From Swiss-Prot:
This is Transmembrane protein 106B. Residues 114-267 are lumenal. Keywords: Cell membrane, Disulfide bond, Endosome, Glycoprotein, Lysosome, Membrane, Signal-anchor, Transmembrane, Transmembrane helix, Transport. It is a single-pass type II membrane protein. It comes from Danio rerio (Zebrafish). It is found in: Late endosome membrane; Lysosome membrane; Cell membrane. The chain crosses the membrane at residues 93-113. Glycans are attached at residues 141, 147, 160, 179, 252. GO terms for cellular component: late endosome membrane; lysosomal membrane; plasma membrane. Disulfide bonds join 210-249. Residues 1-92 are cytoplasmic. In neurons, involved in the transport of late endosomes/lysosomes. May be involved in dendrite morphogenesis and maintenance by regulating lysosomal trafficking. May act as a molecular brake for retrograde transport of late endosomes/lysosomes, possibly via its interaction with MAP6. In motoneurons, may mediate the axonal transport of lysosomes and axonal sorting at the initial segment. Belongs to the TMEM106 family.
Amino acid sequence: MGKALSHVAKHTCHDECQDSLTSSPGYSAMQTDDSKSGGDVSQFPYVEFTGRDSVTCPTCQGTGRIPRGQENQLVALIPYSDQRLRPRRTKLYVMASVILCLLLCTLAVFFLFPRSIDVNYVGVKSVYVSYDQSKRIVYLNVTNSLNITNNNYYSVDVANITARVQFSQTVIGKTRISNITTIGPLDMKQIDYMVPTTIADEMSYMYDYCTLQSIKVHNIVVMMQITVTTVYFGHAEQVSQEMYQYVDCGGNTTALHEYSLNTPLTG
């Protein structure tokens, strides 16, 4: 008897709830909308947009299209784990890029900054002497040595060496050597060059001195002038030196003469 009453009560409540729902204004509005649309879901068919009237859907992984002009009206739903919701750390990347650029610029300036190229005159390496007795001329082939040091972190080319020998305010010999050698980074090379000289004309009196048999050493003082031209990265640099040197005009000499009166640096 109790079960029957419970069932009847539940059925009665169901009918009353349904009547209350159907009589509500919201339900009537929904029924009105359905009646206008015919109650058929075919009013919302699947439409594929192609061509210029559509754009790529940003949340469809490039496989869908949406009508053009509705980009600001449609709302895209993406998963919470999507990469686009994560912070891009733009400031961190920009700061790291700036620090890396500054480091590279500092290294480039350090290694490419031009440093000095040192030229050290070693001395006279050898002297070959010959005479012209009839014309009272003294010929001297003077071979000199230079130490050229490259203090840069890149190679430099020794383009040419210009040398002059001067005796008693008169230039008695000069030479020019081109395309000599290449010096590596932080390296040093010794270069030998020969200057042919002639003592004649108003200095013919030196013939008697150089051929005098009563003395063994016939030293004369000459001024050596050298200009070394180096090239790196298309830039030419010149280093000049002047020094006074003893030269024996009385006979051939093969020993290195390291002594000089002074070695002032002029370039």
